[in-house]
Amino acid sequence: MTSSSSFSRFDGRAQDQMRAVKITRGFTSNPAGSVLVEFGNTRVMCTASVELGVPRFKRDSGEGWLTAEYAMLPAATAERNRRESMAGKVKGRTHEISRLIGRSLRAAVDLSQLGENTIAIDCDVLQADGGTRTASITGAYVALADAIKVLQERGVVPGSPLLAPVAAVSVGLVDGNVCLDLPYEEDSRADVDLNVVMTEHGEFVEIQGTGEETTFTRAQLNDMLDYAEKGCRELVAAQKAALGI
């Protein structure tokens, strides 16, 4: 692993150490699934709502659908950001993250076993300190599991659509050193930034990687993926503990 003896992380963690992770189920009472997920100081409310019917392109297919939306509250960051709905235009970054969350969660559900029902995932960032998209995916899986349980209890879902857990984590190169689960202080100055989505079985759902300030080698990429795999294993354990499985 790439490391310098003089390097120390902003918050004192080891390079391969996650921030404190907390998953609270039943955070609100209206949705079928509702979770508050915390990665250190990053806090995201993830909900899963059930809608009868599917989009037009799925009608009469016998399959369900899962969609996702992501947003940040105005005061989620140190400097207030105007609501995108008030500005009249959703930013490209917001669309990108929404689609990422949707793709990631669809890897965790067998749509053919969902019937013609839609699960809408909403991830609202209450406080942002790096890793909001990865926290959203990790928390949303738990909300999804609760929503599917509600559907099964109501007799709406004919099968068992929930698949293996999916979790996500950030990893990057900070001053040339591989670091896991970057807070904003590290993320904002990272040489390389990676977001990795994985299943419980160690399979990749998505890898997003960018050389923000420099290029990176295959060896460094392998190191970052090793760190990400370790982080995702720990996150899956946290998901299963929250669900009592």
From Swiss-Prot:
Listed SUPFAM superfamilies: Ribonuclease PH domain 2-like (SSF55666), Ribosomal protein S5 domain 2-like (SSF54211)
Calcium as UniProt keyword: no
Keyword check for Electron transport: no
GO BP field: rRNA catabolic process; rRNA processing; tRNA processing
Catalytic activity: tRNA(n+1) + phosphate = tRNA(n) + a ribonucleoside 5'-diphosphate
Pfam families, per database record: RNase_PH, RNase_PH_C
Stretches assigned to coiled coil: none
EC number(s) from the headed UniProt entry: 2.7.7.56
GO molecular function, one term: tRNA binding
Enzyme class at the top of the EC tree: transferase
Keyword vocabulary terms for this entry: Nucleotidyltransferase, RNA-binding, rRNA processing, Transferase, tRNA processing, tRNA-binding
Binding, phosphate: 93, 131-133
NCBIfam families: RNasePH
Family, as annotated: Belongs to the RNase PH family.
Record's function text: Phosphorolytic 3'-5' exoribonuclease that plays an important role in tRNA 3'-end maturation. Removes nucleotide residues following the 3'-CCA terminus of tRNAs; can also add nucleotides to the ends of RNA molecules by using nucleoside diphosphates as substrates, but this may not be physiologically important. Probably plays a role in initiation of 16S rRNA degradation (leading to ribosome degradation) during starvation.
HAMAP family linked: RNase_PH
Subunit structure, as described in the record: Homohexameric ring arranged as a trimer of dimers.
PANTHER family referenced in this protein's UniProt entry, alphabetically: EXOSOME COMPLEX COMPONENT, EXOSOME COMPLEX COMPONENT RRP41
Protein name per UniProt: Ribonuclease PH
Species name: Corynebacterium glutamicum (strain R)
